[in-house]
Regions:
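N-terminal "arm"/small-domain region of PLP-dependent enzymes with the aminotransferase-like
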Residues: 1-68, 80, 84
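Conserved core of the PLP fold type I
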Residues: 55, 61-204
Length: 209
């Protein structure tokens, strides 16, 4: 079986990580994977995480299978944290996934299965995996302008103009915070305008946090 498989191109980020590790210069900067590193270049476990793990270790009484949607208690708590308890629980549904990419993949699979969605709108630029997932699933993709390299800020006027071309039942993929790869975020006022546009156009927002 394996002799019929073709070699895939190496991951660009992993290549950069390897090059960084081999670089002997003392003044090098790692701008690759988005994880915190201390002055020694290590990624320590945060004290709050350590403490939480210790509490869980002492209190957890089972590792039995919890079902396809995962831990209901965890889901409710994380939902309250993200939404600041501003939405009625009856309007919320949860399903846990292996990371943000896995969650987006599952959502897009669900959307594709309905056979009712149109194009998926992705920012330009965006995280390359977003386009890769859509290509893998065979879904139609449109891009919308996002980042102005001259001002290093969101070009909201052009973004809004592009998104005006959305049609009913399209999907709009947004970055909830720390836009990848630009780091440029929408202001609260701009979020309000985009939310109104989503309602007016009757499109489905997917927000990658």
């Amino acid at each position: 079986m394996f002799e019929h498989l073709n070699s895939q191109p190496s991951d660009k980020i992993m290549e950069l990580m390897a090059q960084y590790a081999e670089d002997t210069r003392t003044n090098k900067l790692d701008l690759g994977v988005g994880v915190y590193k201390n002055a020694e270049g290590a990624t320590p476990i945060m004290k709050a995480v350590k403490k939480s793990e210790e509490i869980l270790h002492r209190s957890q009484d089972s590792k039995s299978y919890v079902g396809l949607i995962g831990s209901i208690e965890f889901s409710k708590n994380i939902g309250g944290l993200v939404l600041n308890n501003s939405v009625d629980d009856k309007r919320l549904s949860f399903a846990q996934a292996p990371g943000g990419t896995g969650a987006l993949h599952q959502l897009l699979l669900l959307a594709r299965a309905t056979k009712s969605v149109g194009n998926v709108w992705v920012s330009n630029p965006s995280w390359p995996n977003h386009q890769a997932i859509l290509k893998h699933l065979g879904m139609n993709m449109n891009s919308y302008y996002y980042f102005d390299e001259t001002t290093c800020e969101v070009n909201f006027d052009q973004m809004y103009k592009d998104l005006n071309d959305m049609r009913e039942n399209d999907i709009l993929l947004l970055h909830g915070c720390c836009h990848n790869p630009t780091g440029a975020n929408l202001s609260l006022e701009q979020w309000v305008e985009i939310t109104q546009l989503i309602q007016d156009k009757n499109v489905l927002p997917f927000i990658d946090l």
